[in-house]
Amino acid sequence: MNNTIINSLIGGDDSIKRSNVFAVDSQIPTLYMPQYISLSGVMTNDGPDNQAIASFEIRDQYITALNHLVLSLELPEVKGMGRFGYVPYVGYKCINHVSISSCNGVIWEIEGEELYNNCINNTIALKHSGYSSELNDISIGLTPNDTIKEPSTVYVYIKTPFDVEDTFSSLKLSDSKITVTVTFNPVSDIVIRDSSFDFETFNKEFVYVPELSFIGYMVKNVQIKPSFIEKPRRVIGQINQPTATVTEVHAATSLSVYTKPYYGNTDNKFISYPGYSQDEKDYIDAYVSRLLDDLVIVSDGPPTGYPESAEIVEVPEDGIVSIQDADVYVKIDNVPDNMSVYLHTNLLMFGTRKNSFIYNISKKFSAITGTYSDATKRTIFAHISHSINIIDTSIPVSLWTSQRNVYNGDNRSAESKAKDLFINDPFIKGIDFKNKTDIISRLEVRFGNDVLYSENGPISRIYNELLTKSNNGTRTLTFNFTPKIFFRPTTITANVSRGKDKLSVRVVYSTMDVNHPIYYVQKQLVVVCNDLYKVSYDQGVSITKIMGDNN
């Protein structure tokens, strides 16, 4: 060894008491044995709007504790005609609500979307929940007997506070019967389809077939002690209102804020969807691909099959077509002598006043080149220059034809419109498919009448992404960084006498152009507060809401 290294050790002070960093004293743990346990549930249709509910009862004298719940769901074979695919992470999006109860009431519960949010940084959990090209890509059936999707099973990890530190945090049964209840979303929320797919029959025949698995622990001479858990509580604000309030807040560990689009029953049809590939570029490429067949047409005469309001012009020899204040260059090779190239100049357009600004999708293309195939009667596009963005891809079809639009907005062909897709994904956030557009310009949180926090930038979102290693567009105020399980979580504590028992959130939405159709997508503010509870095992399993620092 180097002399400097040797001397630095020899010269050390031996009189100082030092901790051993090369060995530890091993301790003999509680005697226990874990096992993977699976059970079937009892299905009912007692949920809101006749939603399916699965109940799983866990009562075994040899199961002392449990955690790490996994829900298995069978997806059936899909046959028929039309376009069809499952939404990404379909297993999570099947779930509306999960609760764990004992004879003393609900121990813990969570909304399906918050469960998904909690697992969004777990790539393995997301993969097993139904994220694959086989499930998520849009497949096509051409005859009634065509198989569109093969049967499959997805596995949904139900992340709970009882998983945080394995055995330490596990839910102890204390000789109690534990019931896990899962409420499912409507089938329309988990599929993407076009109008030719027979969804009515599929919906009638679709049956949720769940199985619950968990790790059960048999423990010898268990010594159960009280513990703390956080339980999320979600409040959804009124449509287009910038405020939402959570009441009866006594001890909260965090507060999260995000927005959701509200499409309603008629606004959930879109022009395109990329399927399994979910990057922003994939959304844009899928959208552009759908538009091109209507935008550039090779025909032996003026194109047919379009509405009378469509403005389709023949491309001149120099390839330059002027659309209002923009020029589009079009060059298609190998066009037969008896045919011409046409450009659709008002494919999709929107405006709130005549003779004012017009939002015209055709103008967003600046150069289009390709080659016409006489064998397939189609154009193979080689280079497309455009400014289409994720917001464009996220505009519901209904907004192009809404009463707010003073123009005939949707001038696509009937053939193209028939390929539009119904998308009712329940977990979409923001106003675009990727939640890229930050529509909150200012956030203020009040605890009672006092301002707890305010920001004019997305700092709380940036910190949430850094701390959770996920990018879901949620703004979060965290009041607890205390190591879990071994310490009582730190909370913001109420003072009821001073009116400090509610958290009020107010946002200022970002300014948007009223001539852009996305401006009219309705939105809702969502606030999620994590309340602190104490779990006791004196007489079965029960929880008590923490009301202050002294609990």
From Swiss-Prot:
Q: How does it sit in the membrane?
A: Peripheral membrane protein
The record's principal subcellular location, in a coarse class, is: membrane
More about this protein: Displays structure similarities to capsid proteins.
Which species? Vaccinia virus (strain Western Reserve)
GO annotations of cellular component type? membrane
Q: Name one Pfam family in it.
A: Pox_Rif
Q: Give the result of V24F, as annotated.
A: Confers 35% resistance to rifampicin
Q: What does this protein do?
A: Scaffold protein which forms a transitory spherical honeycomb lattice providing curvature and rigidity to the convex membrane of crescent and immature virions (IV). This association occurs concomitantly with viral membrane formation. Targeted by the drug rifampicin, which prevents the formation of this lattice, and hence virus morphogenesis. In the presence of rifampicin, irregularly shaped membranes that lack the honeycomb layer accumulate around areas of electron-dense viroplasm.
One GO MF term, please? identical protein binding
Highest taxon above the source species: Viruses
The encoding gene is OPG125
What protein name does the entry list? Answer: Scaffold protein OPG125
Keywords for this protein: Late protein, Membrane
Query: What's the impact of mutating K17R?
Result: Confers 30% resistance to rifampicin
Subunit arrangement? Homotrimer. Self-assembles to form a layer. Interacts with OPG158 (via N-terminus); this interaction is necessary for OPG125 association with membranes.
Q: Where in the cell is it found?
A: Membrane
Per UniProt, what does mutating N480D do? Confers 80% resistance to rifampicin
Query: Mutating T30I has which effect?
Result: Confers 50% resistance to rifampicin
Tell me what effect the entry lists for Q27K: Confers 50% resistance to rifampicin
On induction, the UniProt comment says: Expressed in the early phase of the viral replicative cycle.
